[in-house]
A protein has these predicted regions:
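Catalytic/RNA-binding core of pseudouridine synthases
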Residues: 1-106, 110, 114-236
Length: 236
């Protein structure tokens, strides 16, 4: 087998993209009897699952070609709450006055109606128009808990230290968003986006515009360009 490969991996939850690279590198070393260079073409957060494209050997020189490709995700959002990281790994808080079912709010540890008059639960039409407003070229500010470099340091490392810093916004393109399922507070969507788009930020921005707040409870990448997760190998 050629050691210069395009390797499609279906990443499970709970492992970092760098952890996947290390595993594949180890497997190739066993297979070929020597170290083989392996690199990724765009990370997934540890809690996320789905398609990672790894390149080995001389193919690593083509990483920039893959970094530019569009991506398709399936995402699950929880409305009515926010997270310090935009996903399940952060500290979860109830969004002020967001629509709720009433009764005790287990996540926030208090009555869901303690914050004064509630905004109504978003109806389907409001949800559709709000989500539709994000289609096209938009300005997006990447999350502070991300791998973006700020003065040579990863943003997530600065955020963990409590360092105060700002990340400049940038233009990204949302080609399409489809609502797959909606039963408040849970929302499932399918997004086709340009390279560099953060789905965590998109989820938060949708929540802000709805007046409910939102964070990601699940994220799965199903396509990168023409490469599909259906053709990817499962992690051993």
């Amino acid at each position: 087998m050629d050691e210069n490969q395009i390797i499609l991996v279906d990443k499970p939850a709970g492992i970092s993209s760098f952890g996947v690279v290390a595993k594949i590198r180890s497997q190739l070393k066993t297979e070929f009897g020597h170290k083989v260079k392996v690199g990724h073409t765009g990370t997934l957060d540890p809690f996320a699952t789905g398609l990672l494209i790894l390149l080995s050997g001389k193919m690593t020189k083509k990483s920039n070609e893959f970094l530019k490709l569009d991506k398709v995700y399936k995402a699950e959002l929880k409305l009515g709450y926010t997270s310090t990281t935009g996903d399940i790994e952060g500290e979860i808080s109830k969004y002020p006055n967001s629509g709720a079912f009433g009764g005790h709010d287990r996540e926030a540890g208090r009555s869901a109606r303690d914050d004064g008059p509630e905004r109504p639960v978003p109806e389907w039409g409001i949800l559709e128009s709000t989500i539709g407003s994000f289609i096209g070229e938009i300005e997006q500010t990447p999350p502070k808990f991300s791998a973006i470099k700020i003065n040579g340091q990863r943003a997530y490392k600065l955020a963990r230290k409590g360092t105060d810093f700002e990340i400049p916004s940038r233009k990204v393109k949302i080609y399409d968003i489809k609502i797959l399922d909606y039963h408040y507070p849970k929302l499932k969507i399918r997004c086709h986006v340009s390279s560099g788009t953060y789905i965590r930020t998109l989820a938060e921005d949708i929540g802000k515009k709805l007046g409910t707040g939102a964070y990601l409870t699940a994220l799965r990448r199903i396509k990168i360009g023409d490469y599909n997760v259906k053709d990817a190998k499962k992690m051993l």
